[in-house]
């Protein structure tokens, strides 16, 4: 990004076709967090365009205020707390809840940090565990990452939170990235398709590409980073 333009990027490095469909949602949609009496309900403040995974839930999207949300796999995610009676939020609609209700990262962090609901995480249609974490960014360039670890929500917020991949957890990704920063990206970068290696490469290249106010050049630069960290299907 430069001072006036923010260009987010997303690669879908899933092992199979997630049967994605695009949906355009208007403002004023009434929603509920789960098929349960003990859930939260809301009416969407903002319209959004989203991508559905397996056509059962929102995994990525952007709302009319420029808030972008992306849901990625994280093996370490654990939502369970003993004797938890908070209202239920289905993992499949968590991303949509954020897009419906918040215009900025600051707003989302302020509300989600209250932890007023618990996450319900049924298995994915292919049998995989739905262990996921969420990243968001807004039109100002601010970003945040949300990870449920041992039943507690851990939030990382700031303009420096520009890259998220998969395992390990974000704090450990930063530690690994610090090591490679000492070596220097022009000397050597890790080249495997492991999430930690892709995190390091993306973190280096997102700062190495030209920081420009030209929209076409900026988009091309982000795509070049995405190609470098994409994993072939299969």
Cite the ranges covered by each PLM segment.
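A contiguous strand-loop segment
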Residues: 1-86, 119
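C-terminus-biased signal that marks the final domain/tail of proteins
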Residues: 1-7, 120-122, 129-131, 139-141, ...
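Short acidic-glycine loop/turn motifs at beta-strand connectors
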Residues: 2-5, 63-65, 138-141, 147-152, ...
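A short, surface-exposed interaction/processing loop segment used at functional sites
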Residues: 15-36, 154-181
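Generic beta-strand structural signal
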Residues: 58-60, 65-67, 95, 132-134, ...
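Peripheral peptide segments
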Residues: 61, 74-75, 150-152, 207
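Proteins synthesized as precursors that undergo proteolytic processing into mature forms
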Residues: 85-122, 208-211, 215-226
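Catalytic cofactor-binding cores of redox enzymes
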Residues: 114-152
């Amino acid at each position: 990004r430069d001072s006036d333009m923010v260009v987010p990027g997303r690669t879908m490095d899933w092992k199979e076709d997630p049967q994605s469909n695009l949906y355009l949602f208007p403002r004023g949609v009434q929603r509920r967090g789960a098929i349960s009496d003990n859930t939260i309900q809301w009416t969407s403040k903002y319209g959004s365009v989203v991508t559905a995974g397996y056509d059962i839930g929102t995994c990525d999207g952007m709302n009319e205020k420029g808030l972008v949300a992306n849901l990625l796999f994280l093996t370490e995610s654990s939502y369970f707390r003993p004797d938890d009676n908070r209202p239920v939020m289905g993992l499949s609609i968590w991303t949509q809840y954020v897009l419906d209700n918040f215009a900025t990262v600051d707003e989302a962090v302020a509300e989600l940090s209250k932890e007023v609901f618990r996450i319900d995480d049924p298995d994915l249609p292919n049998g995989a565990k739905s262990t996921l974490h969420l990243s968001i960014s807004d039109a100002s360039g601010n970003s945040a990452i949300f990870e449920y670890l041992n039943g507690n929500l851990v939030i990382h917020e700031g303009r420096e939170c520009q890259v998220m991949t998969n395992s390990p957890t974000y704090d450990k990704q930063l530690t690994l990235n610090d090591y490679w920063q000492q070596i220097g990206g022009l000397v050597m970068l890790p080249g495997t398709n492991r999430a930690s290696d892709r995190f390091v490469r993306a973190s280096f290249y997102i700062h190495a590409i030209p920081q420009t106010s030209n929209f076409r050049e900026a988009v091309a630069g982000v795509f070049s980073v995405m190609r470098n960290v994409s994993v072939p299907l299969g």
